[in-house]
Amino acid sequence: MLNTKFDELMEFPCAFPFKVVGDAHEALTDRVVAVVQRHAPGDYSPTVKASSKGSYYSVTIRVTVTSKDHIETLYTELAGIEGVRRVL
């Protein structure tokens, strides 16, 4: 797992925003929601913004997380989506 200090800095459960930056592809949002649904089922309404040149999309989604491990798992899974460049 990742070596983070989320457990020292946060109280769980809490809403946590993830920003996924990836290649501009219309399926990116659906892929992000699918990964989140596997780990935290719910009704999500992500926001999507295109980069100034339109080459990339950033998808922001707020997820209720229950632990440090939950956050780290989501970071790892979201980073594994095809076309994803960064997860913030």
UniProtKB/Swiss-Prot annotation:
A cellular component term, taken from the record's GO annotations: cytosol
Pfam family, one: DUF493
HAMAP family associated with the record: UPF0250
Similarity comment: Belongs to the UPF0250 family.
Protein name per UniProt: UPF0250 protein Shewana3_0990
Organism in which the protein naturally occurs: Shewanella sp. (strain ANA-3)
Lineage: Bacteria, Pseudomonadati, Pseudomonadota, Gammaproteobacteria, Alteromonadales
